[in-house]
């Protein structure tokens, strides 16, 4: 093979290599974007399910906080209503916890921080409910302090806000986070610090 033909062959190989690299890079980029889209769509599906479950949880928790706890020992009816409402609250909280775990905070593009905060917030809410369940079981009685009542009402506000936001076809995650900020500050003492750490304290 002459030197001239060798140079032509080398140029052709280099051009082919560059072409393959460009095509492969575009393919990877398109696949990555597709994966991000799938991940975000799945997150919205989980959030929609959580919204439906949370709406029922909020209804039951509202019924629970309206019942006169002081009559639990003297009234079997009140005691039964407290038990039934809290049992459902606890079950729904566990269901929400499962769906919250499915939410992906990776491969969500520039919304990664928002999804992380939503997931963190839901875990903290469910942690409070689980803590109250453990307390009721340990004390074998429904004893709720004023601070705990305030947190229960905050839980109701959070799930009501999520349900309201999910009524729109296009969910604004930042608006959702703003709507649950105040009740989250009631539930989680470290929430303000968490917001500051991710630059969402405005």
What positions do the PLM features span?
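Short, Lys/Arg-rich N-terminal segment immediately upstream of the first membrane anchor
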Residues: 1-8
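Hydrophobic membrane-insertion alpha-helices, especially the h-region
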Residues: 8-28
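Short acidic DE-rich linear segments
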Residues: 197-202
């Amino acid at each position: 093979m002459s030197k001239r033909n060798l140079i032509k062959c080398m140029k052709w190989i280099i051009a082919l290599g560059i072409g393959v690299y460009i095509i492969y890079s575009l393919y990877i980029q398109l696949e990555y974007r597709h994966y991000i889209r799938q991940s975000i769509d799945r997150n919205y599906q989980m959030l929609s399910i959580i919204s439906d479950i949370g709406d029922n949880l909020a209804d039951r928790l509202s019924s629970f906080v309206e019942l006169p706890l002081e009559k639990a020992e003297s009234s079997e009816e009140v005691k039964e209503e407290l038990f039934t409402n809290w049992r459902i609250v606890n079950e729904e909280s566990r269901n929400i916890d499962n769906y919250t775990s499915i939410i992906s905070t990776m491969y969500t593009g520039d919304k990664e921080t928002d999804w992380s905060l939503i997931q963190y917030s839901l875990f903290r809410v469910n942690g409070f409910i689980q803590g109250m369940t453990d307390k009721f079981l340990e004390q074998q009685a429904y004893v709720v302090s004023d601070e705990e009542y305030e947190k229960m009402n905050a839980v109701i506000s959070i799930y009501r806000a999520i349900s309201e936001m999910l009524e729109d076809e296009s969910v604004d995650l930042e608006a959702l986070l703003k709507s649950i900020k105040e009740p989250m500050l009631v539930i989680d003492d470290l929430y303000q610090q968490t917001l500051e750490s991710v630059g969402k304290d405005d």
